[in-house]
Amino acid sequence: MSLAQQGIRGVGARVVALLAFAAFINYVDRGNLATAGPLLRDQLGLSNTQLGLLLSSFFWSYTPGQLPAGWLAERLDPRRVLAAGLAVWGTATALTGLARGFVVLLALRLLLGLGESVMYPTSFKILAVEASEGQRGRANGFLASGQLLGPAVGTLVGGLLMAWLGWRVVFILLGVASLLWLWPWLATPSARIPERSTLLAAGLADAPSTTMILRRRELWASCLGQFCGTYTIYLVLSWLPVYLINTHGFSMAQMAPIGAGVYALSAGTSVVTGWASDRWLLAGAGTNRVRKSALIAGLAVATACLIACARTSSVGALLALAGCGVGIGLWTPALFATAQTLAGPHAAGRWMGIQNCLGNFAGIVAPVVTGIVVDRTGAFSGGFLIAAALALIGMVAYGLIVGRIEPIDWRASAASPLLPALPPQG
């Protein structure tokens, strides 16, 4: 069924499809180092800690890059900002295939992170303006499915190609292929993003300042929730190939379809979750109830399955990994939609820049912590249990701290005290 047939026509089916494909490319290009990890580590003589640093280093530039990316998304045409970022990250991916040592790989991972940092602030700005609340679940479900299919295809196709051609050739091919996305995107008619002059004419020049955004408890609770949830994503994204090969004895060719299946299940769940949430809203359910149900249920499923990964045999671990995929698929579209709902069209770029900046510190922490745990204990169990504990904290953040998930009245917020008390839950 096409996007237009599913009711995304008002958002612009082509825009949503291209954003989803950009998210797909984004995650293929950031995740291919994890797929290449077993080969690259042996060829270059890297330790698990060094490999963890390479996997983490992407976020050293990606995470702080969210802040200027959010600012640019609201000051310039977000479509052009996204195109420039993709050009940078596609080039960095291709050049990685030519790297000969740890230092060069580290520099290219930093460049990749800087280019990819524009993806979500620009996408959220576009969707916050273009999508109504009743369309937001499906639009974000497709965006999340692109994000989650990226590792699926990257792990499956990339893993098989690396086993055949070697990791260097695959990086070059993927980088060049990524750049081809620019042609249809730049040829797409501009989305209905209001210009700065339009906002001024509409009397919205006093729409929220960055200081006003930073005063909201909802923002800080959302940042905590994102950190706790994305820790699991980045543990799996970074270490799944090594975990399957070293712990359970799978070959590179066997690992690829297993890893891809986890991500594909997650992507399918995200599309179904987005569709179901919109149907629930149209049936009369409140936004707060719909979003919180998906956020908390997703993290609850992930928690149970992470504990199972730490405790079970190979067969049980595969089932638990599949369950983690379902949990991530439940959680991710609601994460995206919640930020867009709370921030509204005039603050979505900066809000998501801040939230993604702080939330994605998990991408820095998870690969390194897991690598250290594996080096010291010889097993992944401790890494999975840390992720499970954080997922529980994320449930508390969404259930008790974030408050009601509904559009913030920024005009009223201008006169509010710092981090005001939130209304009762409902």
Protein language model regions, located:
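Juxtamembrane intracellular "pre-TM" segments in multi-pass secondary transporters
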Residues: 2-8, 192-223
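Conserved MFS/SLC helix-loop-helix module at the cytosolic interface between two early adjacent transmembrane helices
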Residues: 64-103
